[in-house]
Amino acid sequence: MTFMTRLFCAGGALLSLTALATIAQADGRDWNDGPVVNVASIRTVDGHFDEYMHWLATTYRKQQEAAKTAGLITSYRVMVVEARTPQDPDIYLVTEYKNWAALDRLGGKFDQVSAQVEGSVEKAAQSEADRAKIRTVLGSRTQQEALLK
């Protein structure tokens, strides 16, 4: 190889690497969009914690596993926390979705999962009404993880 050929090859490689680095930083952000996470805050009625945990370990788990199999969610967790006041949650239900688009038309898709697990949408609705006697949903929040580069 001649000196000029080597020089052109080295220059071309350097130019290619510079272009790749520029493309990688083109959006100017120091993070990428991560999964979307919903956290529901639950407060169990005094004396009914074990009953609610039993429901979570049985029916809820079946629903969430069916939702994972259907590709509706990527993961779920049940977090037991120490409530600081009587108005604080004692359980967080954490559900992870691939992205914001995964939430589009999610209600109808989850109705199908509920019907599959509990027999019908009506039975699932009655089951939810019955759970109101042993727990209160204090609210929920949905957020997106920022994956730092």
Outline where the language-model segments fall:
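Bacterial N-terminal signal peptides that target proteins for export
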Residues: 1-13
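Immediate post-signal-peptide N-terminus of mature secreted/exported proteins
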Residues: 26-51
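An amphipathic, aromatic/His-enriched active-site/gating alpha helix that lines ligand/cofactor pockets
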Residues: 28-31, 62, 66-74, 96-149
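Short hydrophobic/aromatic beta-strand micro-patches
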Residues: 43, 94-96
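C-terminal segment of classical bacterial N-terminal signal peptides
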Residues: 15-24
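N-terminal, post-signal-peptide region of Sec/Tat-exported proteins
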Residues: 45-89
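Residues embedded in well-ordered secondary-structure elements
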Residues: 15, 29, 82-84
